[in-house]
Amino acid sequence: MNTIKYLTIIILAFLFVQCCEKNIQGNEKRITIDLEERTETSVFDLTDSITVVPLHTSDSCLIATINQIEKKKDTLYIYDMQQSAFLCFKTNGSYLFRISDKGNGPEEYQHIEHFSVSETGEIFLLEPWGNIYQYSNKGVFKQKIKLLHVLESYNEIYVRGNSIIIISVSGDILYYSLSDGTYQCFHLYERMNAFFPIKRTSIYNDSIMNVSLFDNQIYKITQEGLIPSWSWDFKDNNNSEQNIKKLTSRITYNPNDKSVLTDYVGKGKPLKQFIYTSCESNRFKIALMEYNNSFLHVFHDKMKHKNWVFKRTKENTIFHTCTYTDNTFIYYDQPFTRGWRNLTCITEEILGDKYNVYTNLKNDSDSNPTVILFHLKE
C-alpha cells in the first residue's frame, strides 16, 4: 500500500510540474529583453531546416513579381500585382492553379490590395475599396462580399474561422463576421506620416494579433476590440510616454511630408527603438526592430526561456528581408533588397549543397523567382 501511495505522489508531482511549465511557457505576459546584450546566433539555432523551392516555370504560371506570399502547410500562395494574378504552388515547386479574374464582370476584380488564406485553404482577395472575392481551396470562385463604406481604404485582410479583419492605413480596423454579416469598427490611432499600421498584424494559431506602434504591446483583435495579450519590455530602451506624446503631436498626417521612419528613431531622436513587426511561432516570440540606426532581431525561446538578440546571424542572414507565415520565414529575391543597407540573406554556408540549385535558378532569367523557406524549430 505504501508503495502505491509513493508512486501516486511521484506521478502527481510530475504532472503538476509539467502543467506549471506549460502554463509558464504559454502565459508570459511580459518578455524582458536587454537590447545591448547581444547573442552570437547561428541561423541553425533558430531553424530546423531550410528549403529551396524551384517554382515550376511554364507559360501558364509565369510570375513577374511577388508582391505577397503566404504559406499554409505544404502550399504556397503568391500574388503578382503586375499581372493581377494569384498563383498557387506546392512547397516542392509543383504548380497547382492560377486565379486571373481581372475585369469588370460581377465575379471579376479590378485591383487586389492584399489576400488571406483560411485554415481550410479558402482564398480571400481584397480590393482597396472594400470588395472581397472568396474562392475555394481549388481556386473556384464562391462569392463576392461587398463591405459597407466605413473605412477610408481597405488595405490588409486577415481571416480566421468566421472572422475577417480589415486594416486601413487610416489607422482603423474593421471586424466582419462571415456567419451573419455583422461588423464592428475600431480606431487604432490617428494617421501619421512615416508610421503606418500596415504589416503589423500576424496570425498565431487561431488568433489575429497586432503590435502597437510605440509601446511594444501585442493585442489580440476580436469582435469586442483589441484585447491586450502580452508585451515586450526593453527596460531602459522602452519609449517613454512623454516622447510618444511629443512625437504623435509632431507628425500629424501631411501627404506632402517626405520624412521617413528612421528620421524619428535612434540616438537623439524621439524614439529609442521601433518594432517593424512582431510575430509568434510555437517555439518563439519574435520582434524585428529598428535600433541604433540598424536592424535588430529579437527571438525569445518560449521553451528554454532564452533570448537571442542579434543584428545578423553568424552566416550573415537577416530576416527583415523575409515574410513570416506558418512557422516559416520566406525569402524571395527582391531587387530593392540587394543594395538596401547592404543586406545579404542567402549564403553558401546556410544552403550547403543546395546553394548551386539556388544560384542556377537565380541566374536563369527565364525561370520563376526563387523562394527559400526557413522552417523555425518547433
Indicate residue ranges for each PLM-predicted region:
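Blade/loop signatures of beta-propeller domains
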Residues: N23-L55
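C-terminal motif of bacterial Sec signal peptides marking the signal peptidase cleavage site
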Residues: V17-C19
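Conserved blade-ending motifs and adjacent loop-strand segments that build the rim/top face
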Residues: W230-K246, M303-N327, D333, G339-W340
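Blade-loop segments of beta-propeller domains
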Residues: H56-S60, S94-T120, E127
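Short coil/turn segments at the loop-to-beta-strand junctions that recur within blades
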Residues: D59, S100-E108, L147-S153, Y189-A194, ...
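Repeated scaffold domains used in trafficking and secretory/extracellular systems
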Residues: T65-Q68, Q110-H114, V150-V159, N193-T201, ...
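Short beta-strand elements that form the blades of beta-propeller/WD-repeat-like
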Residues: T32, T75-D80, G121-E127, N162-S168, ...
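Beta-strand-rich domains and repeat architectures in extracellular enzymes and scaffolds
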Residues: I50-S84
